[in-house]
Amino acid sequence: MTNQQDYTQDNDKLYRYLFQNRAVRGEWVRLNKTFTDTLNTHHYPKAVQDLLGEMMVATNLLTATLKFDGNITVQIQGDGPLRLALVNGNDQQQIRALARVDGNITENMSLHNMIGKGVLVITIAPKEGERYQGVISLDKPTITECLEDYFVRSEQLHTQLIIRTGEYEGKPVAAGMLLQIMPDGSGTPEDFEHLTTLAATVKDEELFGLPAEELLYRLYHEETVNLYPAQDVQFFCGCSAERSSSALLLISDEEIDEILAEHKGSIDMQCECCGTHYFFNKEAIEKLKSTKL
């Protein structure tokens, strides 16, 4: 077993790698503090925590495939007790997530029972250029399987996703791997099938507890794998007092006055992602109102 100092060197890291003789590329990511920071200010049911972890890993792996600066939003909306699950990540591997629950969700509740009638929406937003949005049917047992199907349909590329969530040494962890045949057409289905068969043997404790290099060696010790430098992954909400102020400016003066009257002369705005509170008293509100003039 790898000791703690060894495995933690790759906590909250994303690696890209390439099989030299197979024309197949891969990615690996593990979320430790990033996942904990996401959950810290919320009391999500266990099934929702696991789903968010799965979606976060998927989003990290998806953003690593971008050939441009931008971000990807992976969002589930439904009419079940889980009304919304949303993850947003960018090409810098900054990620945030939130969920809205309205009803009882048991620990082992299935994806379909949590969501009810719903869809999975992926929005790709380049910093320059047009946004792209894909709507995916939730007709598979897991988000991972739905996303694999999305890759096949949208990019027509053989793709394997392996994503696991759980605990390691008493702390929440989510990790995953992506394998994809190269889009230049040089890879063969046989090569891809060979590598995915090996990847499918990975154990949870290996994904959660091994450094990337050792994990890849265990899975592919007979292959030549080029492992590229890691990219740091971190929770990043992006909220600020300025953004909260801008949101207040969209509300009519009459409605703001009603809110102030109901809440003893101050407005408390709380970020859904990180839980930060932004307080605005009457003086601050009047100053904001003056900027509308």
Predicted regions, residues:
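Interaction interfaces in information-processing and related assembly proteins
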Residues: T2-P229
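Cys/His-clustered metal-coordination modules, chiefly Zn-binding fingers
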Residues: A199-L293
